[in-house]
């Protein structure tokens, strides 16, 4: 006997969470629960506005269609909508007990704001000091100066930077100009500095600052391959698709000598704990990019270890579909 339930959640965000062009006031998504006999499995379907190709309503329609087949005993292919494919594949993997339970709860802290505050946070980091800094929101020169100050002040710090394709080549060069060449090797990578891949490649080769592909990974013509100046690919499962697609990308990256980083798309605590399990399984040597829970005002169904945020339980969620 198979049953399935689809829940909808809405979690208020902290003030000041801005995506590309809009403030994100709440994080809205779906949780799916599959039940077969004594076994159950959960997954999260949460398209990210401005980044996902599908809306939440479109994802819900696709999920309901897939679930209708599943409860009838008909096995369907992965959804073509990445967030749906990811959430349903997680639920199936939990149900089939193929998603390992061990998790990598390390997270590269996401740093925004005042450099003095960042310094205190980063100095207190235990173990390997890896942090992520969003760049491209302010002047490129300011970003360069902040990165330089942090690397200079903390000799054991490695930074991951993310520009979200926001710079022209000239602005990217303006950023690099303010980062001491002797410190640039401690930038693990800068995600997609320029508006085009060609400009980003040239930037990496001209400055010695390694880059990573992020948005590119989700484009139809993208190939995972070794290239001069390219250090990593960033895999955001909600935007990429099923667990098997994520696994394929990780394997291709490792074969090409690239680092693969499992990264969040601002999922709820349930989705984040699954990403931590995915990271421990597929990329155990790499700190995942999962420091987004504190952008929210609550957790959902499954808590992140040691988080003080209140937990929204299953009983508090709205059921949108059940069979």
Swiss-Prot record:
InterPro entries linked: Enolase-like_C_sf, Enolase-like_N, Enolase_C-like, Mandelate_racemase_C, OSB_synthase_MenC1, OSBS_N
Enzyme Commission number: 4.2.1.113
Pathway recorded for this protein: Quinol/quinone metabolism; 1,4-dihydroxy-2-naphthoate biosynthesis; 1,4-dihydroxy-2-naphthoate from chorismate: step 4/7; Quinol/quinone metabolism; menaquinone biosynthesis
MF (Gene Ontology): magnesium ion binding; O-succinylbenzoate synthase activity
Swiss-Prot/TrEMBL GO biological process terms: menaquinone biosynthetic process
List of residues binding Mg(2+): 162, 191, 214
Keywords assigned by UniProt, alphabetized: Lyase, Magnesium, Menaquinone biosynthesis, Metal-binding
Cofactor: a divalent metal cation
SUPFAM superfamilies listed in its UniProt record: Enolase C-terminal domain-like, Enolase N-terminal domain-like
Catalysed reaction, written as an equation: (1R,6R)-6-hydroxy-2-succinyl-cyclohexa-2,4-diene-1-carboxylate = 2-succinylbenzoate + H2O
Active site, per annotation: 134 (proton donor), 236 (proton acceptor)
CDD domains referenced in this protein's UniProt entry, alphabetically: OSBS
Family designation: Belongs to the mandelate racemase/muconate lactonizing enzyme family. MenC type 1 subfamily.
Its job: Converts 2-succinyl-6-hydroxy-2,4-cyclohexadiene-1-carboxylate (SHCHC) to 2-succinylbenzoate (OSB).
HAMAP family noted in UniProt: MenC_1
Name the record gives this protein: o-succinylbenzoate synthase
Biological source species: Yersinia pseudotuberculosis serotype O:1b (strain IP 31758)
Lineage: Bacteria, Pseudomonadati, Pseudomonadota, Gammaproteobacteria, Enterobacterales
């Amino acid at each position: 006997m198979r049953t399935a339930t689809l829940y909808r959640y809405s979690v208020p965000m902290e003030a000041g969470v801005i995506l590309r062009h809009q403030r994100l006031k709440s994080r809205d998504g779906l949780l799916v629960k599959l039940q077969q006999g004594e076994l159950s499995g959960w997954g999260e379907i949460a398209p990210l506005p401005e980044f996902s190709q599908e809306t939440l309503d479109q994802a819900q329609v696709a999920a309901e269609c897939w679930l209708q087949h599943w409860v009838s005993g008909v096995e369907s292919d992965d959804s073509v909508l990445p967030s749906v494919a990811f959430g349903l594949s997680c639920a199936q993997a939990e149900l089939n007990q193929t998603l390992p339970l061990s998790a990598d709860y390390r997270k590269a802290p996401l740093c925004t704001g005042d450099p003095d505050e960042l310094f205190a946070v980063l100095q207190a980091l235990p173990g390997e000091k890896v942090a992520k800094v969003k760049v491209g929101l302010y002047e490129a020169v300011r970003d360069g100066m902040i990165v330089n100050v942090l690397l200079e002040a903390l000799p054991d710090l490695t930074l991951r930077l993310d520009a979200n394709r926001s710079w022209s080549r000239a602005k990217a060069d303006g950023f690099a100009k303010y980062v001491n060449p002797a410190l640039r090797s401690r930038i693990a990578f800068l995600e997609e500095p320029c508006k085009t891949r060609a400009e980003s490649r040239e930037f990496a080769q001209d400055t010695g600052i390694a880059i990573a592909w992020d948005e590119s990974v989700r484009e139809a013509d993208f190939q995972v391959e070794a290239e001069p100046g390219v250090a990593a690919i960033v895999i955001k499962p909600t935007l990429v698709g099923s667990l098997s697609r994520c696994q394929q990308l990780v394997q291709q990256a490792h074969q090409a000598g690239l680092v693969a980083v499992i990264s969040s798309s601002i999922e709820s605590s349930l989705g984040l704990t699954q990403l931590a399990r995915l990271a421990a399984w597929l990329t155990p040597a790499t700190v995942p990019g999962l420091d987004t829970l504190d952008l929210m005002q609550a957790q959902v169904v499954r808590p992140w270890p040691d988080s003080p945020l209140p937990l929204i339980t299953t009983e508090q969620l709205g059921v949108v579909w059940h069979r």
